[in-house]
Amino acid sequence: ELLPAGEAAADEKIHARSVQLSSETHKLIAGIDLVEGEGSVVTPVEYKRGRPRDGAEGPEAWDADRVQVCVQALVLRDNGFTVNEAVVYYDSTKQRVRIPIDEVLVTQTLDTVSRARAAATAGLIPPPLIDSPKCPRCSLVGICLPDETAAMMRFRQEARGDDRQLTLFEPPEEA
């Protein structure tokens, strides 16, 4: 269990799993796989199944992963903790990638959050990816249903002006 910031002794080790916190300042909720640190200085750790991308100086976290852990850092900061870096652990390669929480990343993250909110309030759903190798590994594939959505969109375009019921499959040929 993660004690509120300031309640732990300055040298007390923190190791809390599956932490849920919110930020009133940023209107965000974060689920954090692991929070580790000492006293009120902590590091969020996010576990990913995949692998890091290859960077010029070695393994790097993907942009989406960097933004995710920055949200976690912002929420922790809003709850009184000091967060200077985050870690993404990639299970496929057993590598920990450290991410400094600097002003550039904070600005990028808040901009991403703002754009996500704008997209959500606009009510427009982005089109699904077509035959993307990312989809089967995505945690939202069961909600997004990219193949099914793309098929329905094709039928909807073909059926404009037609009052047929939309289906995923062509009706059987009549004998």
Identify the meaning behind each predicted range:
Residues 10-113:
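Mg2+/Mn2+-dependent nuclease catalytic core
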Residues 1-12:
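Solvent-exposed, charged helical/coil patches
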Residues 115-136:
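Immediate flanking context of iron-sulfur cluster ligation sites
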Residues 108, 112-119, 158:
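Residues that form generic nucleotide/phosphate-binding pockets
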Residues 81-84, 99, 125-128, 146-152:
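Short conserved catalytic/interaction loops centered on acidic-Pro-aromatic/His motifs
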Residues 150-175:
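Short microdomains enriched in Cys/His and/or Lys/Arg
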Residues 133-146:
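Local cysteine-cluster metal-coordination motifs and their immediate loop/turn environment
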